[in-house]
Amino acid sequence: YLLGADSTGRDVFSRLLYGARVSLSIGFAGIAITMVLGFLAGGLAGYFGGAFDFAAMRFVEFLMAIPSLYLLLAMRSALAPHFDSAQMYVMIVIILSALGWAGTARVVRGMSLSLANAQYVQAAKAMGESPVKIIIRHFLPNVLSYLIVGATLSIPAYVLGEAALSFLGLGIQEPSASWGLMLAQAQNDTKVLMLGFWWMLTPGAAIFATVLCFNILGDILRDAADPKKD
């Protein structure tokens, strides 16, 4: 065994790789849903304006005012405690997406307000195009660079969210593996500190490396997409 075995004889390296698949796929799936919801909500608010824009932004501000960790734990605790791993996987993606779209919607709404008065958008309205078609066809190309950069920078938060839930026993459960679950198992095993402290270091190092890499990649993409950069 490359990294040894845990207290039940399972290969730590194999579980680390399997946990990467679970943790990273939750991040990618969650951020994809978040970007779609945030773009549509922000685009519609910027397009229609008025009362719809006011109501949508007050709801967004309400969500953003609540500490995300407490809201995450509250939403998870309100659900049935005995989901299997597949059901838990879906629920974590839904919960993280439901909490993450508000920030994206607020930024997209601000960008859409200026686009709504553009001549080509007014021409599309005069030709009878539907609001959704206008938002996708004319707004999306102008905000796509922000969505890509925002998604890259937000993936670490989703990985950390899954790790936090699993570490607290509210996320992925045995016999599946995730980085947060591996941290929880290492903490609860009294033999770890005496015989195999690397059981705790390996999932922690994987989370740290993933968060660092995505943050660096996001900074690079943000600099590349900055129109003010020389």
Task: Please annotate each region the language model reported.
Residues A5-D230:
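Alpha-helical transmembrane segments of integral membrane proteins
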